[in-house]
Amino acid sequence: MNYPPSAELNDPFVGFLEGMGHNPQASLDFFDASTKADGKDLDNWDYLVAKGDNARAWPPGDDGTPLGHDALGHALESATIGIPYDSDATPPKHSAGSTELVNRIVGEYGKNPDRLDGSPLTDSLGNITAEYMRDVQDAVGGRIEVKTYGSNAELEALADQGQLREFLGAVGKDPDAYGAIVTSQQAVSTELINEVFHQRDTYGNVLPEELSNRVAPGAEIVGIMADSRTQAVYDDKIAADAEFNEGLATADKWAGRAIDTGLGRFPVVGDAAGWVIEDIREAVVENYTRDSSAEADMERDEFLATQRAGSASAMYDATYTAAIQAGMSEEQAKTMAGSASQQVKDSYGQGRQ
């Protein structure tokens, strides 16, 4: 299955992987199977993804990156999300097999984040992370259970060991991945906030504490994303702020998909769901976009501070709106929103540690 030994930049395996990218079940089965090579069983995962003696020697492209890694990312997207990688359809609920594969992906690249430096895989891994945002927030949260869309990827152990953080940090350096992750995080956090207000009678006097628990995981994730963006722009100089702004502007579908796959727990339907999606999109673009031309001389730490303030503002607005829609007074809504905003600032700092 290795590429032919010639001077031409080609790799016939790319076409095979692109085919897998359009066939979710075949792709999932493939990554869980093995192939006969020289009379030995060769695990397809070890051959294509893991780094070891049996790993594939990928031919480099003109830019020096592995020629087939973009196609590999498409195959992984298809296998984990359950629809062709370029489809906008609502995916099926996550299966035990797809969540197990996500766990392997996070573990592999979380242990070896340097393998994602400049990799064509990162945009696909960002899409996978956005799709599994509930699983990620469930792992990061610890104090609360975040219900997942089907089976749970069980990432908590990887979060405790630091591999989830390393994975997110490496993937978030890619502008498109950054946009997908930040947008999906805002959508899931908005859902969790709305849910707690519509169940406020259950929580009584501990409602503020429950609210803080629900906004903390998302805030920690955007803290990691801010660090990743800062490293990419200021330290590694591998991307410009304009590219990250574009990543945010083109990540709309992740707001819609996060809400579509959570509507059973979200107290809106029809046109109202469309309004929620638009609110999420606007919150992300308004609070995370940076005007590079006007702020070209902004220092690294100052930029991180503005991102922290933007994250807090986005969550303040989501909390205030949810509280008002749930029938709380304006004063109560402002108090709750202020509490959520402060929790975001605290948890954002944890994400940057």
Q: Predicted regions: what is each one?
A:
Residues 1-353:
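Non-catalytic all-alpha helical scaffold/repeat segments
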